């Protein structure tokens, strides 16, 4: 499989919106802005796009973005479940589509109002529309309401099996912050931290402290392959 897709696709455009605590606009507006910025960055037109891929968690249907921007018929579209690592899955799906001739130009996008919109632990009401919602009943009643609390359980098990210590968690958090500190568009631009500051932060869910967690941020990003 690696031989089939190697050197068959490349990132040709990147687009972002501003990142904030309150975007003041809809997630569709954010997604459309990021996709259009990526199209412009690539020197393309909306009509050049014939494939789209995003997260299953994204609230913006491909057809709505296509309508908003003037993108024509799509030869390929897909969605990758879950959060976090799904971003790499989008690139993989887009690369496979291009390598197999399913599409020529694919945009990968994600938009989120992560603070002013729906927030984790705010509860779920109404009828269950899909089986996906059933699993919440296994941990929500016990206080596991956020991604940090879920990942903390995996982290505890991982540390137990491997002997890994907090040193490794610090390195991950520190490397991630370094990326942000060197990005002028990041809320953490120019703000680094050392081990002492990391250790001084409150525990969110043992073994995870504040700096191990992401912010509730609003914005959108898109890349074009």
Question: Which functions belong to the PLM regions below?
Answer:
Residues 1-82, 95, 99-100, 110-217, ...:
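Conserved "HGTGT" condensation-loop signature of ketosynthase/thiolase-family condensing enzymes
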Residues 84-86:
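Short helix-initiation/N-cap motifs at beta->coil->alpha
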Residues 89:
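Active-site histidine-anchored catalytic micro-motif
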Residues 105-109:
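Short, well-structured beta-strand segments enriched in hydrophobic/aromatic residues
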């Amino acid at each position: 499989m690696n031989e089939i897709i190697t050197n068959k696709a490349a990132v040709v455009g990147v687009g972002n919106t501003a990142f904030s605590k309150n975007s003041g606009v809809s997630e569709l507006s954010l997604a459309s802005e990021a996709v259009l910025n990526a199209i412009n960055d690539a020197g393309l037109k909306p009509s050049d796009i014939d494939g789209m891929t995003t997260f299953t968690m994204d609230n913006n249907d491909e057809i709505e973005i296509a309508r908003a921007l003037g993108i024509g018929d799509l030869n390929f579209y897909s969605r990758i479940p879950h959060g976090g690592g799904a971003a790499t899955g989008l690139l993989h799906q887009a690369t496979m589509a291009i390598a197999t001739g399913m599409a020529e130009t694919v945009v990968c996008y994600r938009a989120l109002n992560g603070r002013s919109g729906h927030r984790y632990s705010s509860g779920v009401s109404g009828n269950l529309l899909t089986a996906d919602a059933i699993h919440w009943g296994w941990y929500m009643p016990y206080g596991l309401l956020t991604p940090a609390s879920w990942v903390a359980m995996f982290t505890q098990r991982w540390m137990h099996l491997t002997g890994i210590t907090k040193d490794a968690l610090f390195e991950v958090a520190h490397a991630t912050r370094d990326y942000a500190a060197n990005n002028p568009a990041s809320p953490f631009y120019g703000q680094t931290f050392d081990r002492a500051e990391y250790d001084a932060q409150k525990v969110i869910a043992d073994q995870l402290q504040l700096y191990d967690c992401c912010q509730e941020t609003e914005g959108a990003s898109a890349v074009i392959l």
